[in-house]
Amino acid sequence: MTYLAETVTLNNGEKMPLVGLGCWKMPNDVCADQIYEAIKIGYRLFDGAQDYANEKEVGQGVNRAIKEGLVKREDLVVVSKLWNSFHHPDNVPRALERTLSDLQLDYVDIFYIHFPLAFKPVPFDEKYPPGFYTGKEDEAKGHIEEEQVPLLDTWRALEKLVDQGKIKSLGISNFSGALIQDLLRGARIKPVALQIEHHPYLTQERLIKYVKNAGIQVVAYSSFGPVSFLELENKKALNTPTLFEHDTIKSIASKHKVTPQQVLLRWATQNGIAIIPKSSKKERLLDNLRINDALTLTDDELKQISGLNQNIRFNDPWEWLDNEFPTFI
């Protein structure tokens, strides 16, 4: 028996589950099986990206489930993200074709701009996904070379791919309010979603209010805060107390007889924010999927959790190598 998460209707009429499975840091050797098992449990939203280096495996899991009749393609919301190296209008369609080829799908449901940053492109056969790599000389210097491509040029190239039926919906990720405002002034096709780092240490309430008023769905990543970044040896994360052990979170969890993880996820969904937590355990996967049935936080509890905000951002391009990208300044 499968359990299907509550859905939200996006500004273009498409539906998206409020709870999905994040594919970031999902190991290649188990990724296909985890996607397949998640579909059996009831997951329908899969949040991937070119930069996660596992789109082939995501596609294998998806296509196995479709082939076996567990699900129809139109029932799934398969997400990818345009990496920074492919912002030039000539490279946008090539990058999407690479994603579709890796996924072995005819279209993606949501295609985000991963960051509002344009890197100097490198050929697929030199390095893919390229990550921070913009050439051997740059790599030797610990440097990322930028490419001078306005965001609106990238967006218009993406809009053409929507027209061609290769993308159903467009999204933006890691954008500031001012950038979103500027994009909306020139966009023909409105983004359906904004994906941001979001947890009680970084609540971004003003940005979320603006985006919601603009009719754009907010999707949270790294809902557990510093835990997501510990294995990356992120100094800020290593020096920040875990939310799982915070007295406020533990107290609320104890009151509702749930885990601290469930409190953090429900705080997001109860505020209308979609979540994409990752887990390799079937029990936890189902708990995450059924989070809205597990508990309802009081208004006071919601305020207590939001009151933990310290504006701590763990994923900040200002700290990438030597570049100091001003994405969130």
Curated annotation (Swiss-Prot):
| Claim: Calcium is one of the keywords in the record | no
User: What is the reaction catalyzed?
Assistant: xylitol + NAD(+) = D-xylose + NADH + H(+); xylitol + NADP(+) = D-xylose + NADPH + H(+)
Copy the pathway line from the protein's UniProt record: Carbohydrate metabolism; D-xylose degradation
Query: Which SUPFAM superfamilies does this UniProt record tie to the protein?
Result: NAD(P)-linked oxidoreductase (SSF51430)
Q: Site (Lowers pKa of active site Tyr): give the residues.
A: K81
**InterPro entries hit by this protein:** AKR, AKR2B1, Aldo/ket_reductase_CS, NADP_OxRdtase_dom, NADP_OxRdtase_dom_sf
Q: Which Pfam families match?
A: Aldo_ket_red (PF00248)
Q: Where is the active site?
A: Y52 (proton donor)
* UniProt superkingdom: Eukaryota
EC number of the protein: 1.1.1.307
Question: Keyword annotations for this protein?
Answer: Carbohydrate metabolism, NAD, NADP, Oxidoreductase, Xylose metabolism
Membrane-spanning segments: none
One GO biological-process annotation of the entry reads: D-xylose catabolic process
Q: What is this protein called?
A: NAD(P)H-dependent D-xylose reductase
Whose protein is this, by species? Kluyveromyces lactis (strain ATCC 8585 / CBS 2359 / DSM 70799 / NBRC 1267 / NRRL Y-1140 / WM37) (Yeast)
